[in-house]
């Protein structure tokens, strides 16, 4: 069983049939059914923005889908924040949210699944959809 840290791009694509990466995200999460899928708390916030704009029913649907997919929400603590800051300082092209996901993959010894091919230059753990 693998450990996977999921970037927001994967989950946004999964929930958005019109997204260019939708089919890849659905296929990847189906293959991950027996894996430990980890979502950083900051990623949870990112993927809930649109449902909150739509309304409470949309939020409930996304949260139910995450539960059905057995997603584990991982907190952002001081150690993770420091590692993300270090990554952001040395890789200025990535955003802080992206650095948090990459830092979590390192911290948890997990694969990092994303739609961002550029992340492959930052960590050997990155797997692009």
Task: Report the location of each language-model feature.
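Acidic, PIN/NYN-like endoribonuclease modules and their adjacent C-terminal/linker elements
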Residues: 1-3, 68, 72, 102-129
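Short, well-structured N-terminal submotif of metal-dependent ribonuclease cores
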Residues: 1-39, 51-64, 117
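Conserved glycosyltransferase catalytic-site signature
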Residues: 8, 78, 98-99
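Acidic catalytic patch
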Residues: 17, 67-90
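Structured helix-beta-strand junction loops
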Residues: 32-35, 68-69, 90, 108
């Amino acid at each position: 069983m693998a450990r996977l840290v999921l970037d927001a791009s994967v989950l946004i694509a999964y929930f958005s049939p019109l997204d260019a990466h939708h089919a890849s995200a659905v296929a990847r999460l189906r293959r991950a059914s027996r894996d430990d899928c980890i979502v950083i708390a900051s990623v949870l916030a990112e993927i809930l923005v649109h449902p909150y704009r739509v309304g409470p029913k949309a939020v409930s649907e996304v949260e139910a889908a995450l539960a059905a997919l057995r997603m584990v929400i991982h907190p952002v603590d001081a150690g993770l924040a420091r590692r993300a800051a270090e990554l952001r300082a040395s890789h200025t092209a990535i955003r802080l949210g992206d650095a948090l996901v990459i830092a979590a993959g390192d911290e948890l010894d997990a694969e990092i699944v994303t739609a961002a091919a550029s992340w492959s230059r930052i960590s050997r753990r990155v797997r692009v959809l």
